[in-house]
From Swiss-Prot:
Hexadecanoate binds at T65, S97. Residues 3-289 form the DegV domain. This is DegV domain-containing protein MG450. One of its GO terms (molecular function) is lipid binding. Transmembrane segments: none annotated. The keyword Cytoplasm does not apply. InterPro entries: DegV (IPR003797), DegV_C (IPR043168), DegV_domain_contain (IPR050270). Keywords: Lipid-binding. PROSITE patterns: DEGV. May bind long-chain fatty acids, such as palmitate, and may play a role in lipid transport or fatty acid metabolism. Disruption phenotype: Probably essential, it was not disrupted in a global transposon mutagenesis study. It comes from the Bacteria.
Length: 290
């Protein structure tokens, strides 16, 4: 059975036809006065270019995002569908973007060969899911119900904490009030935002006045939510918008220590489309349990 995977920019993966991996863009829009310039996240704008723009942006410049259109999904599926028996689609978490709905519309047109997953995950979690699906397919006969159940179990074992100090994108996107933003900046708080694959929703859950305190709160939260009796951590990752190697290494090592060296922590750059909303100097810590 020839199978391809179709993802979008939030996966931070690059298209690789030899690996049967295809990528659709999500969009970043830079608005300067009345002028707008649109970029394809991960295609013609990378994280370094975006963060440089955000750092040097004059007052009044805004950055926003836009979804993949129904037509784009349809055209991409049409372009590869004859080469495969099945295309597995993993779009951005439906709780974060309505892009998922466009994928589902197209799925109905190719329902025998296009299966869109309700994964409710983002970033490197998508790469982990693809890897695990490949193993599952080697040991199980494909069925929609079977794969959906596998994905449901996968996402219920995933969680993350996002650490934010630059509140401007959150205010611009209507996710944070100006008053709360002022308080956070005045007291130099680290804002903690939780993400659980169980729901796929982002929620403000705490704040801390130091990075170390924020990291401890994050690990305590993830352990409480994800660790069950006789269950261990399986994978962990640090996703960062920062390019200071030493700083990232210190943050990563602190998480390794807080987890008592229970799991290796990989390091990756955050996708540009997510950074548009989290701002500069933001980072995230992701966990998956067994």
């Amino acid at each position: 059975m020839r199978i391809a995977f179709l993802v979008d920019s939030v996966s931070n993966l690059k298209e690789d036809k030899n690996s049967h991996l295809y990528v659709l863009p999500l969009y970043i829009i830079e608005t300067i006065a009345e002028h707008q310039e649109t970029f394809k996240s991960g295609f013609n704008i990378d994280l370094k270019t975006l963060t440089d723009k955000m750092i040097n942006a004059p007052k009044g410049v805004k950055f926003s995002t836009s979804q993949t259109s129904e037509e784009e999904v349809r055209d991409k599926v049409k372009s590869i569908i004859n080469d495969y028996d099945l295309i597995i689609g993993i779009p951005i978490d439906k709780e974060i973007s309505t892009s998922y709905l466009n994928w589902k519309i197209v799925e109905k047109e190719f329902e025998d060969k296009f299966h869109v997953l309700d994964s409710r995950i983002v970033e490197v979690l998508i790469a982990w899911l693809i890897s695990d699906i490949k193993v599952w397919l080697k040991n199980n006969q494909y069925s929609r119900a079977g794969l959906d159940e596998f994905v449901y179990n996968f996402r219920n074992k995933c969680g993350a904490i996002l650490f934010v100090t630059d509140t401007k994108p959150l205010v611009a996107g209507g996710r944070l009030s100006n008053l709360k933003s002022f308080i956070i900046k005045s007291f130099k708080f680290h804002l903690l935002i939780s993400f659980l694959g169980e729901t796929g929703k982002l929620q403000f859950f705490n704040k801390a006045q130091s990075a170390s305190s924020a990291h401890k709160l994050a690990v305590q939260f993830l352990e409480k939510k994800l660790l069950k009796k006789e269950v261990n951590f399986r994978r962990a990752a640090l996703l960062t918008t920062m390019f200071e190697t030493d700083k990232n290494q210190l943050i990563k090592q602190e998480f390794v220590t807080l987890l008592n060296n229970a799991v290796d922590v990989s390091e990756h750059l955050l996708s540009p489309v997510i950074c548009t909303h989290t701002g500069i100097n933001s980072y995230a810590f992701l966990i998956q349990t067994e």
